[in-house]
């Protein structure tokens, strides 16, 4: 019985996708370019909003099942990071701006195409760390970004 169960559910494990959460579509777009269909992405907001909005508990439950939360390091994104971490202590919180030199007074570094390439590199490195089986796939997509 256990063997049958294992045989039936093995394909699900082999083809399962990592769930990733982002704050808004720009982060999702970059991740999709590198990971393509290898991850499932959920967005907290469909556009950038500076005010913290309460998320329904059913949505928080869905979001907190993610393996990674990518964000640009903005204050609003950090608030959502705390909320997700409370619900799932295992979630990786990744600040995509951690090694990027920002201009004083302008936190919107992603508008610079050269810095956006650094953001893509950060995403690539994290994806490779969590999914070592697809290193070449991610590398090819990252290089074509």
PLM feature segments, named:
Residues 3-15:
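Sec-dependent N-terminal signal peptides
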Residues 16-145:
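Extracytoplasmic metal-acquisition and chelation regions
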